[in-house]
Curated annotation (Swiss-Prot):
It comes from Candida albicans (Yeast). Keywords: Metal-binding, Ribonucleoprotein, Ribosomal protein, RNA-binding, rRNA-binding, Zinc, Zinc-finger. InterPro entries: Ribosomal_eL37, Ribosomal_eL37/eL43, Ribosomal_eL37_CS, Ribosomal_zn-bd. This is Large ribosomal subunit protein eL37. It comes from the Eukaryota. GO terms for cellular component: cytosolic large ribosomal subunit. Zn(2+) binds at residues 17, 20, 32, 35.
Length: 88
């Protein structure tokens, strides 16, 4: 009923998640309570600003994204030289 029966619980309701690695994947529901896996989009809520800060863009390597701003400034050059126009 109350506190004594809580000690009898020994089955895991959550196991490791394939996406985020946390022990938040609900075995019966087949969804992660942390990242929302297997949903395509990551789970994030506005009431959890601290949690958002931990896992948003910029907390990892950003192997691709960190170069995009520089390439944007130059107009995404492809490496092919522009055709020379004869000056008048």
């Amino acid at each position: 009923e109350g506190t004594p029966s809580l000690g009898k619980r020994h089955n895991k309701s959550h196991t490791l998640c394939n996406r985020c690695g946390r022990r938040s994947f609900h075995v019966q529901k087949k969804t992660c309570s942390s990242c929302g896996y297997p949903a395509a989009k990551m789970r994030s809520h506005n009431w959890a600003l601290k949690a958002k800060r931990r896992r948003t863009t910029g907390t990892g390597r950003m192997a691709y994204l960190k170069h995009v701003t520089r390439r944007f400034k130059n107009g995404f050059q492809t490496g092919v030289a522009k055709a020379q126009t004869p000056s008048a």
